[in-house]
Amino acid sequence: MIKKRNTTKISVIGAGSVGATTAYALMLSGVATEIVLVDVNKSKTEGEAMDLSHGADFVKPVNILSGDYKDTEGSDIVVITAGAAQKVGETRLQLINKNINIFKSIIPEVVKYNKDAILLVVSNPVDVLSYVTYKLSGFPKERVIGSGTVLDTSRLKHEIGKRYKIDPRNVNTYIMGEHGDSEIATWSVTNIQNIKIDEYANKENLEYNDNFRKEVYENVKNAAYEVINRKGATFYAIALAVTRIVKAILGDEKTILPVSTLVENYYGIKDVYLGMPCIVGGSGIEKALSIDLNKTEASKLVKSAETLKNTLNNASCL
């Protein structure tokens, strides 16, 4: 449990597009009094810290530093965004061997100075790397969290909201499983302000059929690829997703977010990190929720878990 105190320290490992934008989003949110940026490119972190610090007059007081692992000591949360970037046409799972090797050098250094921190993994493939972090750190599963399908879920809400012309915040739904190509949309539990989506669509004379579900799902699943094809990388939305998770932890909100967590017995799935609805609070992941899926969704989730397990088993650098 993160103890309430006058200062809050967050370290961000990796100062690429995602890491730097995450630091910016955290700065704007006002959740931290100190943000430390660490990267192999020291000049880059120095430049990012300088640029961010020059805006200190416009936000709540925050000290932004460029440092090394020693400077992260005593962090409440360590956000890990370091790793090779996903290239055009490259899947998240194809990144695995590059990023596992990077994590083998990062995680021991993070743990050395942060025995009590919560580790929030953002680097892709996030579910696999969350599991790797869990194993390398020796931390309890509650304190090793992946950003999971928080962003994917936001994309799904956005797609439904756009088509139905409603506030996406009124859409209750989840993307579960891998943050990637095998993720699943939980249509069976999707509702609009507690009205089941099929009932809502029927009442409002809106489209809701197999074609609708397929189009929406494909748009969500391929969203990152579409962004990468156009601008080279995704970073704004994931930075906001990470900030949302951080706020839930630091505020001990006990809110439900579909983060990546160690699944131990859910539809027969064991020993793998997956995006699951979890209660997130001051202790990290306080509980993973075993929501009831229909047979098709459950089968797809099992396959998603198998995909991730096979990737881990086939990783040449483990």
Swiss-Prot record:
Keyword vocabulary terms for this entry: Cytoplasm, NAD, Oxidoreductase, Phosphoprotein
Covalent S-S links between cysteines: none
Gene Ontology terms describing biological process: glycolytic process; lactate metabolic process
Catalytic residue list: 179
Claim: Transmembrane is one of the keywords in the record: no
Function: Catalyzes the conversion of lactate to pyruvate.
Chain positions recorded as NAD(+) binding sites: 18, 39, 44, 69, 83-84, 105, 122-124, 147
Name of the protein this chain belongs to: L-lactate dehydrogenase
Subunit structure: Homotetramer.
Known EC number: 1.1.1.27
InterPro entries per record: L-lactate/malate_DH, L-lactate_DH, L-lactate_DH_AS, Lactate/malate_DH_C, Lactate/malate_DH_N, Lactate_DH/Glyco_Ohase_4_C, NAD(P)-bd_dom_sf
Naturally occurring in which organism (per UniProt): Clostridium botulinum (strain Kyoto / Type A2)
Family, per entry: Belongs to the LDH/MDH superfamily. LDH family.
Catalytic activity of the protein: (S)-lactate + NAD(+) = pyruvate + NADH + H(+)
Major localization class: cytoplasm
Localization of this protein: Cytoplasm
Binding-site list for substrate: 86, 92, 124-127, 152-155, 234
One GO MF term attached to the UniProt entry: L-lactate dehydrogenase activity
